[in-house]
Amino acid sequence: MRTLTLRELNRATLARQLLLERRRLSVVPALERVAGLQAQWAPATYVGLWTRVDGFRREALERALTREQAVRAVLMRGTVHLVSRRDYGLFGSAVAQAGWIRPESLELAEQVHDAIVEYGREPRTKAEVFAWLLDEHGIDHDGGLGFWYALRMAGRLTHAPESGMWKQPRDTRFVLIEHELVDALPARVHLVGRYLAAFGPATRADISEWSGLRVRDIEPALDALEPLRRFADERGRELVDLPRAPLPSVDTPVPVRFLPRFDNVVLSHADRTRVIADEYRSTVIHGGGMVEATFLVDGFVAGLWRVEKGRVRVEPFAPLPRAWRRPVEDEASRLEAWLA
């Protein structure tokens, strides 16, 4: 079994995440290529597409949201993701029974499924949904997260298109997006296949970390995806991968890239050293679920960035090598111009 080095895994991940070179893609194919973007903070998805897509414009994403070609919804790990409409139905079916929602929450959500589907045809706030549940169905609930996640999944409630705009409204509203419910296994086959195409080669623990699925629920999906390629990492752990997925050379050059808050590149593996050294991990991913905006130098997270008075400010973890200083400045200037 071939052993892949850390740098080989790094280059493979960056290639699949469209971070070796920007590609000329429209929004929907780009989202499907990278298995969606984490989207708790809507502007992050715009920066995430800008750093991956050649010529990306904000209007392109806003148009895709308005046309419901792109959907912002609770999916993997119970977090908000921006995905294509096609992937929304399959991803939602795959993770709805992932085990992280208490059975009683799912049962309660199923009881009001038909009613919430009808009620959700018009955009509603969370407060409006819970008031309606009390008034119309006598369900007095404290608004716990488990029930709210279950309600959105069982009722197919997604963030209304305007909640994903660059300038978000103050009150998030939710609306029904129709999709055909798919059996768990074919949905998980699709989900795991998307993950490997976007983040592989990967261990089973990596797939579980990103998807929120238990390893025992991942195994049948891997069986259905056979034949798969198998490798080992430098610690001897088995990696699985799709047969024709790219594996760039270790000496493949990597341009400087700026990643937004919550970017899945730093979140989608159990072992995140393929993109971020352990010594910097707590600086990037810390309390309250915050994931900072970062920049990559030679393919690895080298520091943080923020916008201050209209300027992009970089905070490297260590002094940048001389050869990388100008490329970092140039990419920061490009991002600054785009944000303006």
What are these regions (language model features)?
Residues 1-272, 277-340:
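Long, low-complexity intrinsically disordered regions
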